[in-house]
Every structure is written in C-alpha cells, then in structure tokens.
Amino acid sequence: MPELPEVETVRRGLAPAMEGAVIARAEVNRPDLRWPFPDRMAERLTGQRVERLRRRSKYILADLSGGETLLIHLGMSGRMTVSGDPLGQFVHDHPAAQKHDHVVFHMDNGARITFNDPRRFGAMDLMATATADEHKLLMVLGPEPLGNDFHEDYLVAALKGRNTPVKSALLDQGIVAGLGNIYVCEALFRAGVSPRRKAGQIAAARVSALVPIIRQVLSEAIEAGGSSLKDFRQADGELGYFQHSFDVYGREGEPCRRAGCDGTVQRITQSGRSSFYCAQCQR
C-alpha cells in the first residue's frame, strides 16, 4: 500500500494539472471501489474548480470551488496518472483506456487524470470542505510526521506507558499519520531501536531522537519519488527510486549496512506484517 511519501509524490505530480483547473467532465465507470462512490459523484464533480490539492496521511484531498472536498485513497494498487499536453507541462499523450480505469477527470486545461485500480481497494468520497476534518477516515488521525505538531515532547508522551512493540505503535495512525511498514523499518534502523522493544520502555532521549530521523527518512523518500515495489507509479508513470536506498526493508539475510556491524538483516512477523531489522545493532 502506498505510504506517505508515495501519496505525497502523487499529489505533487497531480498539482500542476489540477490546481486552478476545472473538471470539465468526470467519468465514473463503476459504482464502487472498496466502498460505494457517493451519490451523483460525476455530476457533483463536473464544473468544479480544484482550488487546492493537499494530503492528509495517506489520503489526497481536492478542495473544490463548490464547497466540497474530494477524498482519494489509492488503496493497494491504485494509480493516478496525468496525460495530455495543454501548455507544454505534461509529457504524455492520452493513452488508450485500460481495463481498470475506474474514474477519469477531464480537465479544462487539456489534462486527463486517470484513476486505475486493478484490486479495487482504493476509495473516493465527497464531503463538505468546512467539516472535512470530521470525516470518519480523517477524524481518527494523529499529527502529520512532517508537520509542527509532531515533535519530541509529543512522541514521548504518546508512547509513554504503551506495552505494544514500538513498531506497532508507530504504525498506529492515531499516534502519527501516514507512516507505513517500509518507513518505520527504515527509521528504526537508523535510530538503532529494535522493532520488538516495548514502546513504553524506550528512554525518552531515544524516543526524541526518532522524530528527526522519521522526518529525514520521509523527506529523502519524497525526494526520490517514493518506493516502487509492485504497483506504485508516480503521476507521470515513472517509478519511484527510494527502494534502492533501503537499509533493511526487504533485505532479509543480507549484511547489515551500519558501519562496524557484522550482523545480518532478519525478518520477523509483527501483527501480520514483516519487520526487517538487525538484531545485533538495533536494541
């Protein structure tokens, strides 16, 4: 599933084509994805100007001129790609329609935005912009890890007394929004913290050190266009490249990359997910 860096990469790729442009026509080719689409979605989107394209956790939010916000979740295999060349901004001609092109936005600037999702775990919804934060998928989210509300004192307080492994705690979207398996594994490696360690038993200084490390890992991943392991593509169809910088994720049995450590990367299962770490230098 795309994590924060992948969703932010897609948002940045869509913004030049969508922000300030009008949805001249919305094409909805099925009644649902993971959940049913909102009533009259195509009609409600047609003629709306995209005032702002933003991200909250793993969701893309398009604030529309009519006072509604379109929520988009990529799910497991969803892709949003831009085609067309209205002002020399977009490098691809419109491709032929594909089997799993479920929603298409035809913008008044000539761009076309296609949502393709073979596994159909993605989602779209419409809500009033004024109360968007109260949407059931958004109201439960913790602070953004790249935002000002995610700081050392906050994380120390959030993890205090928790008996769950720190890996599971950091994946809790109510504690911090947008973190996923890949980037938690990578951040814990850089911090030298074992994913098995109980969150509430980690010294405050080590918890505090996690905050800038998490920010750094996410920022590097965004700069690299995210990580492409199976399905993820950027908005222009290109792969992400951060997978080439993984220290532990997907490297089971390979040598630890930390200078001076002769350990090997191990894989364990936590809450049904694979955790990758070096037991020798992550304590």
Swiss-Prot record:
The record's free-text note on cofactor binding: Binds 1 zinc ion per subunit.
EC number, UniProt record: 3.2.2.23, 4.2.99.18
Annotated GO MF terms: 8-oxo-7,8-dihydroguanine DNA N-glycosylase activity; class I DNA-(apurinic or apyrimidinic site) endonuclease activity; damaged DNA binding; zinc ion binding
Reaction it catalyzes: Hydrolysis of DNA containing ring-opened 7-methylguanine residues, releasing 2,6-diamino-4-hydroxy-5-(N-methyl)formamidopyrimidine; 2'-deoxyribonucleotide-(2'-deoxyribose 5'-phosphate)-2'-deoxyribonucleotide-DNA = a 3'-end 2'-deoxyribonucleotide-(2,3-dehydro-2,3-deoxyribose 5'-phosphate)-DNA + a 5'-end 5'-phospho-2'-deoxyribonucleoside-DNA + H(+)
Transmembrane segments: none
GO biological process: base-excision repair
Alphabetized Gene3D superfamilies for the sequence: 1.10.8.50, MutM-like, N-terminal
InterPro entries registered for this protein in UniProt: DNA_glyclase/AP_lyase_DNA-bd, Formamido-pyr_DNA_Glyclase, FPG_cat, MutM-like_N-ter, Ribosomal_uS13-like_H2TH, Znf_DNA_glyclase/AP_lyase, Znf_FPG/IleRS
CDD domains named among the record's database cross-references: EcFpg-like_N (cd08966)
Record keywords, A-Z: DNA damage, DNA repair, DNA-binding, Glycosidase, Hydrolase, Lyase, Metal-binding, Multifunctional enzyme, Zinc, Zinc-finger
Catalytic residues, chain numbering: P2 (schiff-base intermediate with dna), E3 (proton donor), K58 (proton donor), R273 (proton donor)
Oligomer status and interactors: Monomer.
Known function: Involved in base excision repair of DNA damaged by oxidation or by mutagenic agents. Acts as a DNA glycosylase that recognizes and removes damaged bases. Has a preference for oxidized purines, such as 7,8-dihydro-8-oxoguanine (8-oxoG). Has AP (apurinic/apyrimidinic) lyase activity and introduces nicks in the DNA strand. Cleaves the DNA backbone by beta-delta elimination to generate a single-strand break at the site of the removed base with both 3'- and 5'-phosphates.
HAMAP family tied to this protein: Fapy_DNA_glycosyl
Name used for this protein in its record: Formamidopyrimidine-DNA glycosylase
Organism: Ruegeria pomeroyi (strain ATCC 700808 / DSM 15171 / DSS-3)
High-level lineage: Bacteria, Pseudomonadati, Pseudomonadota, Alphaproteobacteria, Rhodobacterales
